[in-house]
Curated annotation (Swiss-Prot):
CDD domains found in the cross-reference section: TOPRIM_recR
Domain Toprim residue range list: 81-176
InterPro entries attached to this UniProt entry: DNA_Rcmb_RecR (IPR000093), Rcmb_RecR (IPR023627), Rcmb_RecR_Znf (IPR015967), TOPRIM_dom (IPR006171), TOPRIM_RecR (IPR034137)
Keyword annotations from UniProtKB, A to Z: DNA damage, DNA recombination, DNA repair, Metal-binding, Zinc, Zinc-finger
Zinc finger extent (C4-type): 57-72
Gene from which the chain derives: recR
The organism's place on the tree of life at top rank: Bacteria
Gene3D superfamilies: 3.40.1360.10, 6.10.250.240, RecR Domain 1
Family: Belongs to the RecR family.
Protein name, per record: Recombination protein RecR
Length: 199
């Protein structure tokens, strides 16, 4: 069945979201139109505001509506000498949820991937190097994902940081708390054995 042009446009627009196929997009559109137009208008307004007003922090590159994000603008954390390098703003939220890290961040917005045309420039590494060259950074914690690209990115950044005599560390990888060994892949088990600590 062919829908009206506006309804078809709404369904197609919802399909841009990850994991949303044609049927899911259709259900979402019908839900908003049939049962919750007020929420649909609120969603449209929030989406419009976010798309026009949210940019990147000039210091760490996470999402913010201001020049600096709340962490970088904080007197205590913004002047921290420890920077944690992550791939995405979602990684910042995950680390913040743990409440254990009190330094500042640098968000790469991806990882090195020459085949996809993602090099050091696209990751903002010139800005990171300026932070390192300022002399205000004592430690760089590399928290890129444990993928081939994430590891390559971590090694590239570590080489860059060594030129500035900055302490470099990498977050640990291994068996998750509550995980069962029989379900853990061999690479993760190898990392767990190689990274074991004395008790």
């Amino acid at each position: 069945m062919k829908f009206s042009p506006l309804l078809d446009e709404l369904i197609q627009s919802l399909r841009c979201l990850p994991g949303v196929g044609p049927k899911s997009a259709q259900r979402m559109a019908f839900q908003l139109l049939e049962r919750d137009r007020k929420a649909g208008l609120k969603l449209a307004a929030a989406l419009s505001s976010a798309m026009s007003d949210i940019g990147h922090c000039q210091s760490c590159r996470t999402y913010t509506e201001e020049t600096l994000c709340p962490i970088c603008a904080s007197h205590k954390r913004g002047s921290s000498s420890t920077i944690c390098v992550v791939e995405t703003p979602a990684d910042v939220l995950a680390i913040e949820a743990g409440g254990h890290f009190t330094g500042r961040y640098f968000v790469l917005l991806g990882h090195l991937s020459p085949l996809d045309g993602v090099g050091p420039e696209e990751l903002g590494l010139a800005l990171l190097e300026r932070h390192l060259a300022s002399g205000d950074v004592a430690e760089l914690i590399l928290a890129t994902n444990p993928t081939v690209e994430g590891e390559a990115t971590a090694h590239f950044i570590a080489d860059m940081a060594r030129r500035h005599k900055v302490l470099i560390s990498r977050i640990a990888h291994g068996v998750p708390v509550g995980g069962e060994l029989e379900y853990v892949d061999s690479t993760t088990l190898a990392l767990s054995f190689n990274g074991r600590i004395p008790l």
